[in-house]
Amino acid sequence: MVSFEDLLNYSLNEEKNKITEEFKKILSEMNQIIDEAYAEVYREYSAKITDLVNKNNDRIRGEIAKMEIENKRLISKEMDYWIENVKENAKKSLYEFVKTDNYKKGLESIISREVSDGSIIYCSPSDQKSISDIIKKKKISCKIVVDEKIVGGIKIYYPDKSLSKDFTLETILNQVFDDIRDKIAQILFGE
């Protein structure tokens, strides 16, 4: 026969086993809920962090692009400064060139070829006498007007045609300089 105590122990063990099984199930469900909640929070914050990182990367790329453009602008500005410096030095050398025999021969050639009776010649103050001598020698009837802005060379105006031709050294220098600007940049900057 089974004693009361054995029966009680058996009954208690049965209940204990049921409670333990229920507790294991509850613990397993709680762990699953915690794992799912953790995974959801992890996904949510991972997405937020990824979004934040992407936004910051886009902002940084934008800043880098702005800086590169600004850098190119500054470099271009500096290159222009040095190229203009070369041009100004070339312009200063014109003052020496107008004193040479080659210049005077070139001036006479232009006058012989381009100036006709009734023309108006604009020239520098230093060239006025030379031009006057050339037109007397060539027997051309024209007017000479001094232009303080001209370093060398001449401008010719044909009133009958309302036409003007510019043979000033400044204009020639500007045209030549514009044509070879890229070559000058290559020499100065290796580009």
Swiss-Prot record:
<dbReference type="GO" id="GO:0033178">
    <property type="term" value="C:proton-transporting two-sector ATPase complex, catalytic domain"/>
</dbReference>
<keyword id="KW-0375">Hydrogen ion transport</keyword>
<keyword id="KW-0813">Transport</keyword>
<keyword id="KW-0472">Membrane</keyword>
<dbReference type="GO" id="GO:0046933">
    <property type="term" value="F:proton-transporting ATP synthase activity, rotational mechanism"/>
</dbReference>
<dbReference type="GO" id="GO:0005886">
    <property type="term" value="C:plasma membrane"/>
</dbReference>
<dbReference type="Pfam" id="PF01991">
    <property type="entry name" value="vATP-synt_E"/>
</dbReference>
<dbReference type="GO" id="GO:0005524">
    <property type="term" value="F:ATP binding"/>
</dbReference>
<keyword id="KW-0406">Ion transport</keyword>
<comment type="similarity">
    <text>Belongs to the V-ATPase E subunit family.</text>
</comment>
<dbReference type="InterPro" id="IPR002842">
    <property type="entry name" value="ATPase_V1_Esu"/>
</dbReference>
<dbReference type="GO" id="GO:0046961">
    <property type="term" value="F:proton-transporting ATPase activity, rotational mechanism"/>
</dbReference>
<keyword id="KW-0066">ATP synthesis</keyword>
<keyword id="KW-1003">Cell membrane</keyword>
<dbReference type="InterPro" id="IPR038495">
    <property type="entry name" value="ATPase_E_C"/>
</dbReference>
<comment type="subunit">
    <text>Has multiple subunits with at least A(3), B(3), C, D, E, F, H, I and proteolipid K(x).</text>
</comment>
<comment type="function">
    <text>Component of the A-type ATP synthase that produces ATP from ADP in the presence of a proton gradient across the membrane.</text>
</comment>
<dbReference type="GO" id="GO:0042777">
    <property type="term" value="P:proton motive force-driven plasma membrane ATP synthesis"/>
</dbReference>
<protein>
    <recommendedName>
        <fullName>A-type ATP synthase subunit E</fullName>
    </recommendedName>
</protein>
